[in-house]
Amino acid sequence: MLLAELAEVSRAVAATPARLEKIARLADALGRLAPDERAVGASWLAGDLPGGRVGIGAATLRAALEAAPPERSGPGLTVAEVDAALRRIAAVAGPGSGAARRRELDALLARAGNPERRFLAALVLGELRQGALEGVLADAVAKAAGLPAAEVRRAAMLAGALPPVAEAALSEGAAGLARFRLRVGEPVSPMLAQTAADVDEALRALGGEAALEWKLDGARIQAHRDGEAVRVFSRSLRDVTAAVPEVVALLRAAPEPRLVLDGEAIALRADGTPEPFQVTMRRFGRKLDVERLAPELPLTAFFFDALVAGGAELLARPERERWAALARAIPAERRVPRLVTRDPAEARAFLEDALARGQEGVVAKALDAPYEAGRRGAAWLKVKRAHTLDLVVLAAEWGSGRRRGWLSNLHLGARDPASGGFVMLGKTFKGMTDAMLAWQTDRLKALATGPLDAWQVPVRPELVVEVAFDGIQSSPRYPGGLALRFARVKRYREDKRPEDADTIETVRGLYGG
């Protein structure tokens, strides 16, 4: 398939808010991919690069696009050719790697038309937002392959990713999907929680009685044991076994020889309170001297679910049964603190105790719900005390899908008194109602300092917005080295001027907290 065809599908999918039309267009494209293009094509349509980032930043990409020659006629780029080029770029390393990546990128863009360039730019930066979430794409794979959507979703859950499932479904049908099952030693995508405003809302949503567990501000881990073989995986399914010898020892000491457990690893202070998230994450760096760092910064594992225990796979079993299996496998001090209640007052006290002890909050869980790997299920509801900052809007991006036609993805910055400017801390389109999107689009158009037909529109830094977020993390992507975690807009502060916004020093203070 030509890249231009895939770029047009992406544009058309972004242009329609209708789920069924998105599915139909995606299914048609998936069905036309050559066998060796199916996995990568599915990845791209999901907005992902199969191998992750390719080492090209926004500044390099912008310069390459500006230097690209005018469009010219000739043979179009194929999906396979572009995939090979991106893999070559990602593989470049060593002295002069930046210049070598730029040469490869220039050669690729020289053969691409403008729609293809826009598609590639969004793909490389991880910003291809076309309203084709994984659920929509899974339904499209099912439609293209003539298979039940539930079977495709379950296979993707167990595979930890949709692209290999798409390739198997399109190439082999039901027989291909049958290969995907939970195997000890191979990670599955973790179940995630939706958000509730408070524990009262969480209990109501879950039908009264629920289990409440501390939400630790640590690193999510999935620990597998098969005899003496132990493997530990991160939330992103990266093998981190070598980084966590404490977890390996705990699993080997368990009374059961076959286990798959879900939990958190966290660095604790001497008084038992948690270190900041970024301190825990020092143990998970890619260049890590574990023998030196582990004694200085030990990790403690706490588990809250069992996917395999007692000789059985437990994904489909109710939460209360999975907890009972976990309790038989792991001692109480290595399980998260837990309360089963239907009493809102008791639940509020449990939350306040967790917060007082430095934890993020609690997760409320439906006692009869299965483990929905890879899904942000309504059976788990997290309740946290959010932080807020007043930040300034520096730019905005045009939305896609339901947000098409609105400036929606806000670039947010903190005031820098030293320079008189602003330091970007991240982007978000979360938390905005349709009315807010319409209002801010009109205001941002009036403040634009660049062309309105560009994908990203810079604006005069005059609008102050109150932003809620869950934490602050280090990030080489932004000039200040910091980024907000899970930022969402609460409201615009029209009563505040840019000089009233929070400063980067305030943000650094929260980070060092």
Swiss-Prot record:
Enzyme class: ligase
Residues at which ATP binds: 213, 220, 235, 264, 304, 376, 382
Active site: 215 (n6-amp-lysine intermediate)
Protein family (similarity comment): Belongs to the ATP-dependent DNA ligase family.
GO biological process, alphabetically ordered: cell division; DNA biosynthetic process; DNA recombination; DNA repair; DNA replication
Name under which the protein is recorded: Probable DNA ligase
E.C. designation(s): 6.5.1.1
Record's keyword terms, sorted: ATP-binding, Cell cycle, Cell division, DNA damage, DNA recombination, DNA repair, DNA replication, Ligase, Magnesium, Metal-binding, Nucleotide-binding
Gene3D superfamilies tied to this protein: DNA ligase, ATP-dependent, N-terminal domain, DNA ligase/mRNA capping enzyme, Nucleic acid-binding proteins
Primary role: DNA ligase that seals nicks in double-stranded DNA during DNA replication, DNA recombination and DNA repair.
GO molecular function term, any single one: DNA binding
Gene that encodes it: lig
Cofactor(s) annotated in UniProt: Mg(2+)
A Pfam family of this chain: DNA_ligase_A_N
InterPro entries assigned to the protein according to its UniProt record, in alphabetical order: ATP-dep_DNA_ligase, DNA_ligae_ATP-dep_bac/arc, DNA_ligase_ATP-dep, DNA_ligase_ATP-dep_C, DNA_ligase_ATP-dep_cent, DNA_ligase_ATP-dep_CS, DNA_ligase_ATP-dep_N, DNA_ligase_N_sf
Catalytic reaction equation(s): ATP + (deoxyribonucleotide)n-3'-hydroxyl + 5'-phospho-(deoxyribonucleotide)m = (deoxyribonucleotide)n+m + AMP + diphosphate
